[in-house]
C-alpha cells in the first residue's frame, strides 16, 4: 500500500528535494539532474537522481566537493525555509552519506587539506582503530572541516538563490516529478 503524505510533508519534501536540485543545477561540475520527484518510494519521501554525462571510473577532489554540496542541499533548504528547529529527520541518510564520503576522502583518497598526507589508504574502521588517538582525532577534525565547508558553500548558494528554491519547490509540489 502506498503512503499518502500530508500537505506539510509534501511541502517539506518539495523544499528538501528542491534544495538538492538547486545545488546540482547551480554548482559547476555537479552531475546533471536526470529526475527529481516527491513521490514516496520505499522509505524515501522523494529523490533527486543525478547521472554523469560519461562513464565515471574515478572522481576528482572537485567532483567529490560537488557531491558533498548536493548532499547538503536538502538539509540546508529545510533550515533556510523552516528554521533550524524545524529541520526534519529526512536528511539523515544524506548526512550519513556525506559523512561516509568525507571520511573516505581523508582516509582512503588522501584528499586532505592537511600538509601531512600521512593518513591515506585506510580501508576499514579496523584500520582506524589501530591508529593512535592523535591521528584519529586529526581524521575526525578534517572530516568535520570538510563537512562544514560543504554546509557553508551550500548555505551561501541557497541564500543567494532562495527565489529559485521557492520556484523549484513549488514546481515539485505541483507536478510531483
Residue spans for each PLM region:
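Interdomain coupling/hinge region of P-loop NTPase helicase/AAA+ cores
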Residues: 1-3
Amino acid at each position: 500500500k502506498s503512503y499518502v503524505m500530508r500537505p506539510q510533508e509534501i511541502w517539506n519534501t518539495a523544499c528538501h528535494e528542491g534544495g538538492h536540485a538547486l545545488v546540482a543545477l547551480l554548482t559547476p561540475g555537479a552531475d546533471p539532474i536526470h529526475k527529481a520527484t516527491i513521490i514516496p518510494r520505499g522509505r524515501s519521501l522523494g529523490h533527486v537522481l543525478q547521472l554523469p554525462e560519461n562513464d565515471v571510473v574515478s572522481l576528482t577532489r572537485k567532483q567529490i566537493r560537488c557531491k558533498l554540496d548536493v548532499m547538503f542541499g536538502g538539509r540546508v533548504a529545510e533550515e533556510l525555509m523552516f528554521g533550524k528547529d524545524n529541520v526534519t529527520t529526512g536528511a539523515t541518510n544524506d548526512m550519513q552519506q556525506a559523512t561516509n564520503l568525507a571520511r573516505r576522502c581523508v582516509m582512503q583518497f588522501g584528499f586532505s587539506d592537511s600538509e601531512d598526507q600521512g593518513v591515506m589508504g585506510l580501508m576499514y574502521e579496523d584500520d582506524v582503530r589501530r591508529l593512535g588517538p592523535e591521528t584519529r582525532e586529526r581524521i575526525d577534525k578534517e572530516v568535520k572541516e570538510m563537512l562544514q565547508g560543504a554546509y557553508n558553500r551550500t548555505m551561501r548558494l541557497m541564500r543567494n538563490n532562495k527565489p529559485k528554491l521557492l520556484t523549484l519547490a513549488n514546481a515539485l509540489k505541483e507536478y510531483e516529478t
